[in-house]
């Protein structure tokens, strides 16, 4: 299994210089990226395409805010055409759904398969990336995640191990529930730290937390997941990516024995 990087992890360096921010990843042997936290314009697309042409690294997906996925289809598609990327990921549930009425949520759910078809006609697969808001229960007792799955048929999903585990759900169980609708996985570990009188969850280097990543990778292979990317909110991104990558490679090598 190949392990890429979600560029939210290196967002500060990427904002300063895309090319220089990718070089340490290339040196680590990273060959796949899910690109996030940049302007999806032609200038950046041209730069990423040039990097891909000179190095063994490519975008497997781009994570885009809902307002652009729905409101600027031509711009998003153009970015994908230039970079050779075939997957677009809706970054999150719109704030109108998180804070608004259930009617707004169900309206968004109803729009997903329709938007999937629009991108599919352009040769692009559309997926949805979740956080922990999707595990909140609605007035009918079902979670938003359950409704997202049951009321759509085409939209793919990108799973986030951290947000699932933080919500008290087993990541490998959620992966199997997604089944063949799982497109990719954000690999993030979960740890806890004391803050005053509270115990606060946070993401951490893979292997330093509580998530069973062997179970995650086994489930990912079982359902035919297309890509996996390391993601973490950290002040030392390259060091932490390297440590996470080493841990995942050890798990991967043991699985082949």
Describe each PLM feature range.
Residues 6-10, 36-38, 64-67, 93-95, ...:
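Active-site beta-loop-alpha junctions enriched in small/polar residues
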Residues 1-16:
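Boundary/entry segment of secreted carbohydrate-active catalytic domains
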Residues 3-7, 33-35, 59-64, 88-90, ...:
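Hydrophobic faces of well-ordered beta-strands that scaffold small-molecule active sites
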Residues 33-53:
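Glycine-rich, proline-tolerant flexible connector loops at the mouths of alpha/beta enzymes
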Residues 12-25, 44, 70-80, 167-175, ...:
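Short, acidic/polar
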Residues 119-210:
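Acidic/histidine-rich catalytic cores of soluble enzymes
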Residues 5, 25, 33, 52, ...:
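Conserved, mostly hydrophobic/aromatic
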Residues 23, 31-32, 46, 55-58, ...:
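Active-site acidic/histidine proton-transfer and metal-coordination neighborhood
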């Amino acid at each position: 299994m190949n392990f890429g990087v979600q560029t939210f992890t290196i967002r500060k360096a990427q904002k300063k210089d895309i090319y220089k921010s990718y070089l340490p990843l290339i040196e680590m042997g990273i060959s796949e990226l899910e690109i996030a936290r940049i302007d999806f314009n032609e200038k950046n697309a041209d730069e990423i395409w040039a990097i891909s042409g000179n190095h063994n690294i490519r975008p497997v997906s781009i994570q885009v805010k809902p307002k652009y996925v729905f409101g600027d289809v031509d711009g998003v598609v153009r970015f994908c055409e230039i970079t050779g990327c075939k997957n677009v990921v809706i970054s999150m549930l719109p704030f109108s759904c998180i804070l608004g009425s259930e009617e707004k949520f169900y309206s968004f759910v109803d729009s997903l398969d329709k938007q999937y078809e629009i991108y599919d006609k352009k040769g692009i697969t559309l997926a949805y990336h979740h956080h922990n808001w999707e595990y909140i229960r609605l007035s009918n007792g079902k979670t938003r995640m359950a409704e997202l799955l049951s009321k759509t048929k085409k939209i793919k999903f990108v799973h986030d191990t951290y947000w699932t585990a933080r919500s008290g759900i087993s990541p490998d169980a959620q992966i199997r529930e997604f089944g063949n609708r799982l497109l990719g996985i954000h690999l993030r570990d979960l740890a806890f730290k004391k803050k005053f009188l509270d115990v606060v969850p946070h993401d951490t280097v893979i292997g330093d937390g509580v998530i069973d990543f062997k179970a995650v990778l086994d489930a990912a292979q079982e359902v035919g997941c297309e890509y996996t990317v390391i993601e973490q909110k950290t002040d030392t991104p390259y060091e932490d990516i390297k440590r996470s990558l080493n841990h995942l490679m050890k798990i991967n090598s043991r699985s082949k024995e």
